[in-house]
Amino acid sequence: MLELDRRCDAADPDTLVLLTPHGIHVEGHFAVVVAGRMAGALDDTPNVALDVPVDRGLATATLAALHDAEIPAVGVSFGGNVPEDAVMPMDWGTLIPLWYLGGRRDPPRSVVVVAPARDRPLAEHIAAGAAIASAAHRSGVRVGLVASADQAHTYRSDGPYGLSPRAAELDERIIRAVGEGRLQSLVDLDPTLVEEAKPDSVWQLLMLAGATGETWRPEIISFEVPTYFGMLCAAYSQH
């Protein structure tokens, strides 16, 4: 993550579009945060906390682009009924990447946070990624895209999801797909493999596939299994 932080600083985006598996879940819909800010802290670690502005202009444009692509999506907020003044709780899938990628800057980088829709077809996530990229291209600002995506969660028998040999099987396939620039191939994953390995990544990676198309070159930085789940860091640069 420190290397991704270095590269993000070098690219110096004005705002980050972040795809999180751990934000709000809306049945049958993708979700785009349209509150004025996001704030939160890690459980039991109150000193790891962030409060960042939402790029509401880009968030609104992203939502419109999803609608234009006929993808079911809703804008979501929290608390106050004036979206500009509302503060959306920040999930850990958002906080941890932002901790490294500009959330602690002064001022912090603004964000647009999008949640996938696991109950929608996998192929629709590719189309959603393309719509998100279209909105970013039209925005006139420098945008970085972050796919927050832990890998398989069944590496340890004492973990919350138990042990499955399919964890390594899935992650090996994902690593190859990322490294070879074939993220779209994940649309053909066996649902049983996904269920047994329990990744939090497939949906955001397919959105990343739609956003990057064939014009971005991947580079794997690291893959580790520090606990019961796998963690993959990769960076993309344009050809």
What role is predicted for each listed range?
Residues D14-T20, V141-Q151:
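Beta-strand elements within well-structured catalytic alpha/beta cores of enzymes
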Residues V26, A130-S139, V143:
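Non-transmembrane, aqueous-exposed alpha-helical and coiled segments at domain scale
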Residues M1-D14, H25-I126, G159-H239:
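Flexible, D/E/H-enriched segments
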Residues D119-P121, Q151-T154:
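Short, catalytically relevant binding-site loops at active-site mouths
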Residues E124-A131, G144-A147, R173:
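Non-catalytic alpha-helical scaffold/packing segments enriched in small hydrophobic residues
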Residues G23-H25, A152-H153:
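Short, solvent-exposed loop/turn segments at secondary-structure junctions
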